[in-house]
Curated annotation (Swiss-Prot):
Enzyme nomenclature, EC number: 2.7.4.22
GO biological process: one example: 'de novo' CTP biosynthetic process
Gene (name only): pyrH
Span of the signal peptide: none
GO molecular function, one term: UMP kinase activity
Keywords: Allosteric enzyme, ATP-binding, Cytoplasm, Kinase, Nucleotide-binding, Pyrimidine biosynthesis, Transferase
Name of the featured protein: Uridylate kinase
Length: 236
């Protein structure tokens, strides 16, 4: 019987990943598939926290002519939509789930309180962190790194639309090569588009490894938990 390689993980989901092939909004089949995989790893005894992006509805940096702070807050609200959708899908599968928002909206989510989040995890509840850090100018990648450090996660699982980290965008450059392993310094020096530099630096300072993988295989989250050699592993 295979044993999970991690006890507590932080799963970072991009908004685009939740949109599936539609590219915008939510694909119910994709959300259900992710929820099913999360249920499977919770049943293994793994504690799961999730950070969701909002790029399937809004990206702060695309708000041309708009105040950056306002655009970023709109992006934070988009992450709340995704968090609630994922919570609903998980609870339909009988997975106890809590959404914690960095911007208070008590009718629909708990406020983010680190100690409460850790207690939820210890009770095998999934915790979804919404609204980024609650501050403009910080991406959801940085949120993932920050929350992973705060809850002392063993690893960040970075689920993307591509199956790892490449030397260039594989959808544009057909000669792009995939990396199996990288150090944080490699990522920063080569300017690879894994996470933004703030997030990478935060992971490096706190020795939090990152596993980058694609969602094209509906079993990939489980495979990563079991230690399968897929995607790209980033470490100190």
């Amino acid at each position: 019987m295979l044993e999970p390689q991690y006890k507590r993980v932080l799963l970072k989901l991009s908004g685009e990943a939740l949109a599936g092939e539609k590219g915008f909004g939510l694909d119910p089949n994709v959300v259900t598939n992710i929820a099913t995989q999360v249920k499977d790893i919770v049943n293994m005894g793994v504690e799961v926290a999730i950070v969701v992006g909002g790029g399937n509805y809004w990206r702060g940096r695309t708000g041309e002519g708009m105040d950056r702070t306002t655009a970023d807050y709109m992006g934070m609200l988009a992450t709340v939509i995704n968090a609630l959708a994922l919570q609903d899908s998980l609870e339909n599968l009988d997975v106890l789930t809590r959404v914690q928002s960095a911007i208070e909206m008590r009718q629909i989510a708990e406020p983010y309180i680190r100690r409460r989040a850790v207690r939820h995890l210890e009770k095998n509840r999934v915790v979804i962190f919404a609204a980024g850090t609650g501050n403009p100018y910080f991406s959801t990648d940085t949120t993932a790194a920050l929350r992973a450090a705060e809850i002392e996660a063993d690893v960040i699982l970075l689920a993307k639309n591509v199956d790892g980290v490449y030397s260039a965008d594989p959808s544009i450059d057909k000669t792009a090569t995939k990396f199996n392993e990288l150090t944080y310094i490699d990522v920063l020096k080569m300017g690879l588009k894994v996470m933004d530099s703030t997030a990478i630096s935060l992971c490096m300072d706190n020795s939090i490894p990152i596993k980058v993988f694609g969602l094209e295989d509906p079993e990939n989250i489980k495979k990563v938990i079991y230690g399968d050699k897929i995607g790209t592993y980033i470490y100190s």
